[in-house]
Structure formats: C-alpha cells, structure tokens
C-alpha cells in the first residue's frame, strides 16, 4: 500500500517502510502487527465516536514526526514483541483522516503500555510442580490491550498519515494475509485435537466402532478442507507492482469463512468421542494421597 501511495501522491512511505523492514530482518525482531481498535459504537465512523480514542488517531503533527493516541485490542504476542506496527482497522472517508495512520514504535516507547489479558487457567500455571500444566513454557500464548498515550513517532517510522483513501486497501491486504495464515495455524491445532480424540477412543476401547471411525474421518475431512483453502489462496496469488507477493484475497476470505465454522464442529465431534472426562491437574496425578486412585 505504501508503494501505491508514493506512486499517486509523491510521498516517501514505501522507502521508509522498506528501510524499516530491513531493520527488523537484520535485527531478527518480533513485530506485533496491530490493526484492531476498541471501536466503541460500531454503527459510527471513527470521527463520530463519543470518545475519540476508540480508534487510533493523530493528535499532533510536528516537523519531525507525529503524536498519536488510542489503543489496539486483542494483540496476540504483544508482550513478547520488540515492535508494534500499527495499521487502520476500517476503510475511511475524509472526515476520518486523522484516524488513517500507520506507523511503527518499539514496545518500550514512552507512552506505550499494555494491559495483559487474563486466561481461564492462568493461576494454575503458578502452582507448585505444575510442570505439564505449563504447556510450552517458553512460547505460551497471550493477548494484551496495547495503549498509546500521546506517543511520539518520528517521521522515518510513519507509513501513512491522513491518506484516508488508502486505508481500505491496507486493511483488505493485511486481512487477506491474516486469513490465509489461519489455513495453517488452526489446522495444526486441529491435527492435535484429532490425535487426542483418536487416543481417547483407544482408551475407551472403541477405536473400531463404526460411529467413532465416521466421526474421526469427518474431523480429518474438515481439517484438510481448511488446509486446502490455505494452500489455494497462497498458490493463486500474484506478484504486485511493489515486488511483493499478494495472496488471492477472495480465496483467503473463503479460508477464513470456513475457519469460523469448521473448527467448532471438529471440537464438537471430539467431545462426542471422548465422552465425560474430568481433567485433573498434574499435581494431583503426582500427589501421594491421590495419585493411585486417579
């Protein structure tokens, strides 16, 4: 999108972004691609919100950069990220131009702070001898609300500032890549769930029962359909004028549409196969008083 802006407007956004991308790659940095705003009243545009901070916006333009306010919500991996790359979250009109901004800041920039989202079993990980309940201790998932309280962004890290007519293009392209990636990451989780369901059937002594096999086959079919969608939108992409590879946006949307449906059915079938199961903690499995009974 920065390339198209430069071609039409004579700006230097694409050069800035290319230099930033090199900086990220050369320093092996993790970047939080942040698009989702709190949004407030969804029936109103950004500029018509009662609280102007419901969408990220520029509050001051200086000779050497801009000052921004707002927040980005549901940011997976934000606390683990070195940088935050901010993008608009909706297509915009001229009245919303102060909200049409894209920029990058380090996580420790002055005025940036994060509110960590609670997990349903997060305190369980703090129990003594939790071990197995920790999951992947080094790469555990999390989400955070990233707040920007009058944060200064130098010009070299600004990639869009009030070019409202390009906000929709940026949103559509980023969303396409995001939806394409779901054809891989969600399918990987599905593989694990299918394996766990098959193991539960073995434990229950019914791996050869026809209705169990039918359900496992359906789970595999649904999961591989999602994978096929991810492959399709990736393979059907094309080279863009800027030199980057753009996945097929229509097929990426099909991929995400199926992702919003099929994993729930896969999980429902897993519940049918597993039956009632009380999942105790690893601490109880190892405790002398309870281990033998469990």
Where are each of the predicted segments found?
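Generic structural signal for well-ordered, non-transmembrane alpha-helical segments
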Residues: 22-25, 67, 188-191, 195, ...
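Internal helix-loop-helix
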Residues: 1-31, 83
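N-terminal low-complexity segments that are often proline-rich with Ser/Thr-Pro
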Residues: 293-294
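Extended amphipathic alpha-helical segments enriched in small hydrophobics
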Residues: 181-239
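C-terminal helix-coil-helix/basic helical segment that borders enzyme active sites and/or dimer interfaces
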Residues: 227-260, 264-282
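Conserved small/polar residues in nucleotide/adenosyl-binding loops
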Residues: 283-290
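FAD-binding core of flavoproteins
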Residues: 38-185
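Hydrophobic alpha-helical scaffolding
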Residues: 10, 134-137, 179-183, 187, ...
């Amino acid at each position: 999108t920065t390339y198209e802006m430069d071609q039409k407007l004579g700006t230097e956004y694409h050069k800035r972004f290319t230099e930033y991308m090199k900086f990220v790659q050369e320093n092996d940095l993790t970047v939080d691609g942040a698009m989702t705003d709190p949004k407030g009243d969804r029936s109103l545009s950004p500029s018509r919100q009662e609280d102007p901070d419901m969408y990220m916006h520029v509050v001051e333009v200086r000779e050497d950069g801009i000052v921004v306010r707002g927040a980005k919500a549901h940011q997976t991996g934000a606390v683990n990220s070195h940088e935050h790359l901010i993008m608009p979250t909706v297509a915009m009109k001229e009245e919303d131009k102060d909200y049409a901004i894209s920029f990058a800041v380090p996580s420790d920039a002055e005025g940036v702070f994060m509110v960590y989202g609670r997990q349903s079993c997060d305190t369980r990980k703090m129990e003594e001898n939790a071990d197995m309940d920790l999951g992947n201790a080094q790469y555990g998932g999390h989400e955070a609300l990233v707040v920007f309280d009058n944060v200064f962004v130098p010009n070299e890290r600004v990639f869009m500032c009030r070019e409202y007519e390009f906000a929709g293009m940026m949103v559509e392209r980023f969303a396409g890549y995001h939806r394409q990636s779901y054809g891989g990451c969600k399918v990987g989780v599905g593989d694990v769930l299918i394996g766990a369901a098959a193991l539960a059937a073995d434990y229950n002594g019914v791996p050869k029962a026809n209705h169990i096999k039918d359900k496992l086959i359906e789970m595999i079919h649904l999961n591989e359909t999602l994978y096929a969608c991810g492959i399709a939108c990736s393979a059907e992409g094309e080279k863009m004028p800027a030199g980057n590879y753009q996945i097929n946006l229509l097929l990426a949307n099909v991929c995400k549409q199926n992702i919003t449906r099929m994993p729930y059915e896969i999980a429902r079938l897993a519940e049918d196969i597993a039956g009632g199961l009380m999942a105790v903690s690893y601490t109880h499995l190892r405790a002398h008083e309870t281990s033998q009974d469990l």
